Amino acid sequence: MKEAITDEMMMQVLSTTQVYTLVVLRKGSKYGEGNAQQIIWEHVRRNLSLRADGLLSIVCPVKDDSEMAGIGIFDADAEQTKNIMDNDPAINAGVLVYEIHPTRSFPKDSLPE
């Protein structure tokens, strides 16, 4: 780090945060059954549409042996995000379940290439 982060610098940067909503997806009771993969495919299609519309800023599928299936960060408040998730095909089919967590972050932050 080239310079020390002062309290003034912190206050300036922190004043730029905005409201976002973090969604944590976990495997539901129907995960891995029947046509779950096709339902997940449609879930992904929907996520890509939400990304294109600017509502879903970050999408991270989790690929390990845990019950966690993924996370997403929505550029929407918790109520709007709940409405979006309640209409997700994987949620409706019981393939995935979700938790919503209101959060704040810095606009224009991104993942490195």
Task: Pin down the residues of each PLM region.
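Conserved, structured core segments of small domains
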Residues: M1-E113
